[in-house]
Design a protein with these regions (language model features):
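N-terminal cap/lid segment of alpha/beta-hydrolase-fold proteins
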Residues: 1-26, 292
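Short amphipathic alpha-helix adjacent to the substrate-entry channel of hydrolases
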Residues: 39-57
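Catalytic nucleophile-loop/oxyanion-hole region of alpha/beta-hydrolase
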Residues: 58-91
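Gly/Ala-rich beta-loop-alpha elbow adjacent to hydrolase catalytic centers
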Residues: 94-98, 102
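Accessory cap/linker subdomain of secreted extracellular hydrolases
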Residues: 116-203
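Short beta-strand/loop motif that positions the catalytic acidic residue
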Residues: 207, 213-215
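Conserved alpha/beta-hydrolase "acid-adjacent" motif
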Residues: 220-230, 257
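Catalytic active-site module of serine/aspartate enzymes centered on a nucleophile-bearing elbow/loop
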Residues: 260-310
Length: 310
């Protein structure tokens, strides 16, 4: 996979690009809450190339050590560059925090005509640091939104805890549930502690083109199905131009990736062994999780093909 590197200083965004030999008209941007030079982003890019489209990975520079007041203009600049190189169709895809990035960008950049949000929530996230302070993997960026636009921070849902209680909540809930990590209670507390006002909700009704929202009922990181349901209702009650596809599964937890991408990440037998150690909810449901990933894969592939031909 040939990769071209981009920097904020030179290009207006931090990213990697891998063109497809099969299609120089459509490109999909992978959004990730870490530096794009990661195994999972590069695997997603390889998977997109094999799906017949060019792929770009975008994320914050390493020095940011997280996503806090991250300018969504990074995505806008990448879209402009792709279109200047002949890519008439530009899409975005994100999972977990990356889905918040994808949705928040797509509602502000009309040139994005395919948005794939895996395990999304419907409100703008608080800013986060991944700087390993005091041995924590994540902590809230106090007083900071995850994103900014035109120099202004987006209104956001405040974190219910500060450091170090925030990360301790992750570990404690994971221990109670038998998972490596869990934060369902933390996110529920965030909603209970702050009104879900319209300004912090992502205005998904402004998204153009194709939109896929996918999640699982056994997700213990946050209640993605609740967020998906609210977004679906918002879209159906508006004069939205998007072609919405909602995919909700009984089993697949927070790691809801297309099956063909999972096989690039890990050998098939390994994912069945590893998942129960990450999320106890998958114990006894390996076949059901795989069936969900296969179904998701088929829907995404068919949507990409339809989008490319449209």
């Amino acid at each position: 996979m040939r990769l071209k590197h981009f920097t904020v200083e030179k290009d207006g965004f931090c990213g990697l690009f891998s063109p497809s030999e099969r299609n120089r008209n459509a490109a999909i941007i992978v959004l990730e809450d870490g530096h794009p030079d990661s195994y999972i982003v590069k695997t997603a890019m390889k998977w997109l190339n094999r799906s017949g489209v060019s792929a770009m990975g975008i994320g914050p520079e390493k020095y940011m050590k997280g996503v806090h007041n991250w300018p969504l203009e990074n995505v806008e600049n990448a879209v402009k560059l792709l279109r200047s190189q002949g890519y008439d169709k530009v899409g975005v895809i994100g999972s977990s925090f990356g889905s918040n990035m994808a949705l928040s960008a797509a509602v502000r950049i009309p040139e994005i005509t395919l948005t794939i949000a895996l395990t999304p929530n419907d409100w703008v996230y608080w800013g986060i640091f991944n700087d390993k302070l005091d041995g924590t993997s994540e902590r809230p960026a106090d007083g900071e939104s995850a994103f900014s636009w035109r120099g202004e921070p987006l209104p956001y849902m405040p974190a219910p805890y500060k450091h170090p209680d925030y990360w301790n909540m992750f570990k404690e809930e994971g221990k109670q549930r038998g998972d490596m990590l869990a934060s369902l209670n933390l996110h529920d507390l965030a909603e209970k502690g702050h009104p879900l006002t319209e300004d912090i909700r992502i205005p998904v009704e402004k998204i153009n083109g194709y939109l896929i929202l996918a999640g699982a009922k056994d997700d213990v990181m946050w209640n993605t199905c609740r967020g998906i349901s609210r977004m679906q209702k918002k879209i159906e009650e508006s004069e939205c131009n998007c072609n919405l596809k909602v995919l909700v599964y009984e089993h697949c937890t927070h790691l809801i990736f297309p099956e063909s991408m999972v096989k690039l990440l890990l050998p098939g037998f390994l994912i069945d062994l590893i998942l129960p150690h990450l999320y106890s909810e998958t114990k006894g449901f390996a076949k059901e999780c795989r069936k969900s990933r296969i179904d998701l894969d088929e829907h995404i592939q068919s949507t990409i093909n339809e989008w490319v031909k449209s």
